[in-house]
Amino acid sequence: MMLFGCRRSLWCALSFLGAAAGYRVGSAYLGTSVLQNQTPFELRNSKVVTQCTMKVELIPALTDNYMYLLIDEESKEAAIVDPVQPQKVVDAVKKHGVKLTTVLTTHHHWDHAGGNEKLVKMVSGLKVYGGDSRIGALTQKVSHLTTFQVGSLHVKCLYTPCHTSGHICYYVTKPNSTEPPAVFTGDTLFVAGCGKFFEGTPEEMYAALIEVLGRLPPETRVYCGHEYTINNLKFARHVEPCNDAIKQKLAWAKETYNSGEPTIPSTLAEEFTFNPFMRVREKSVQEHAGERDPISTMGAIRKEKDHFKVPKD
């Protein structure tokens, strides 16, 4: 979400300016004191997803954001995705005993890129990647299919404009590994949803979701920018009330979130079963939208979602 016009803009500004000496990560406090103005979301548990070749720590930030610490287990080199709260990043890096070398910025909005300039002052020598000159502290501007390494991990940049005109998703693999790849999707693809079309069109979001992300291996794990899963699934249920995959995922998401755990990651295979924006080619979604083609359907359901009143149940 953008800082301007953002319903939490005041909180965003205050949380960034306030010096954070300590944070809760898992069940332990880090640092010397606790930030008085932390949101309930920030106090939720972090989550570590471990594979034999890479480790991803989901770090809650602000009111519903996630930062992701990506660790190459072989070299102990690390990258951070969208480090809006730099002190929390530094604390996580120290906890894991790794070397932070890289910042992966999905887009320029404050709640994703707003910590870059502070972080590069806290950690020297960082390479800051992104696809938009509006990104703070940018050192490496990338484009579609740009590749680079984080230790032994291979990172491929995927250009997915629409939410913003310079949005990049980061697809991470380990050569010769049998483990699932990971993709960090920022505000393009959410669990059961997609980002608002602030600087783009239905055609662009269709291309991003179906023709770019949708062609990645189905087992790819999706790490998105926000904890919007429950509300997204309630809209998905509204679009397809008879879809059992949506009902099952919503029940799971409620239970998982209420237990203090993130509902992320999902997989691309899952998204095609319950995400209406990934299902715009399905007859049931087109009939709900009153459209006959997937791109018109994409535009119609995004417009409807923008004004959707989320039910309590």
Curated annotation (Swiss-Prot):
<keyword id="KW-0479">Metal-binding</keyword>
<feature type="binding site">
    <location>
        <position position="187"/>
    </location>
    <ligand>
        <name>Zn(2+) 2</name>
    </ligand>
</feature>
<feature type="region of interest" description="Disordered">
    <location>
        <begin position="285"/>
        <end position="313"/>
    </location>
</feature>
<feature type="binding site">
    <location>
        <position position="187"/>
    </location>
    <ligand>
        <name>Zn(2+) 1</name>
    </ligand>
</feature>
<comment type="function">
    <text>Thiolesterase that catalyzes the hydrolysis of S-D-lactoyl-glutathione to form glutathione and D-lactic acid.</text>
</comment>
<keyword id="KW-0809">Transit peptide</keyword>
<dbReference type="Pfam" id="PF16123">
    <property type="entry name" value="HAGH_C"/>
</dbReference>
<comment type="subunit">
    <text>Monomer.</text>
</comment>
<dbReference type="InterPro" id="IPR036866">
    <property type="entry name" value="RibonucZ/Hydroxyglut_hydro"/>
</dbReference>
<dbReference type="GO" id="GO:0005759">
    <property type="term" value="C:mitochondrial matrix"/>
</dbReference>
<keyword id="KW-0496">Mitochondrion</keyword>
<keyword id="KW-0862">Zinc</keyword>
<keyword id="KW-0963">Cytoplasm</keyword>
<dbReference type="InterPro" id="IPR032282">
    <property type="entry name" value="HAGH_C"/>
</dbReference>
<feature type="binding site">
    <location>
        <begin position="302"/>
        <end position="305"/>
    </location>
    <ligand>
        <name>substrate</name>
    </ligand>
</feature>
<feature type="binding site">
    <location>
        <position position="163"/>
    </location>
    <ligand>
        <name>Zn(2+) 1</name>
    </ligand>
</feature>
<dbReference type="InterPro" id="IPR017782">
    <property type="entry name" value="Hydroxyacylglutathione_Hdrlase"/>
</dbReference>
<feature type="binding site">
    <location>
        <position position="109"/>
    </location>
    <ligand>
        <name>Zn(2+) 1</name>
    </ligand>
</feature>
<dbReference type="InterPro" id="IPR001279">
    <property type="entry name" value="Metallo-B-lactamas"/>
</dbReference>
<feature type="compositionally biased region" description="Basic and acidic residues">
    <location>
        <begin position="301"/>
        <end position="313"/>
    </location>
</feature>
<comment type="similarity">
    <text>Belongs to the metallo-beta-lactamase superfamily. Glyoxalase II family.</text>
</comment>
<feature type="binding site">
    <location>
        <position position="226"/>
    </location>
    <ligand>
        <name>Zn(2+) 2</name>
    </ligand>
</feature>
<feature type="binding site">
    <location>
        <begin position="226"/>
        <end position="228"/>
    </location>
    <ligand>
        <name>substrate</name>
    </ligand>
</feature>
<protein>
    <recommendedName>
        <fullName>Hydroxyacylglutathione hydrolase, mitochondrial</fullName>
        <ecNumber>3.1.2.6</ecNumber>
    </recommendedName>
</protein>
<feature type="binding site">
    <location>
        <position position="111"/>
    </location>
    <ligand>
        <name>Zn(2+) 2</name>
    </ligand>
</feature>
<dbReference type="InterPro" id="IPR035680">
    <property type="entry name" value="Clx_II_MBL"/>
</dbReference>
<dbReference type="GO" id="GO:0046872">
    <property type="term" value="F:metal ion binding"/>
</dbReference>
<dbReference type="Pfam" id="PF00753">
    <property type="entry name" value="Lactamase_B"/>
</dbReference>
<keyword id="KW-0378">Hydrolase</keyword>
<feature type="compositionally biased region" description="Basic and acidic residues">
    <location>
        <begin position="285"/>
        <end position="294"/>
    </location>
</feature>
<feature type="binding site">
    <location>
        <position position="107"/>
    </location>
    <ligand>
        <name>Zn(2+) 1</name>
    </ligand>
</feature>
<dbReference type="GO" id="GO:0004416">
    <property type="term" value="F:hydroxyacylglutathione hydrolase activity"/>
</dbReference>
<dbReference type="GO" id="GO:0019243">
    <property type="term" value="P:methylglyoxal catabolic process to D-lactate via S-lactoyl-glutathione"/>
</dbReference>
<feature type="binding site">
    <location>
        <position position="112"/>
    </location>
    <ligand>
        <name>Zn(2+) 2</name>
    </ligand>
</feature>
<feature type="binding site">
    <location>
        <begin position="196"/>
        <end position="198"/>
    </location>
    <ligand>
        <name>substrate</name>
    </ligand>
</feature>
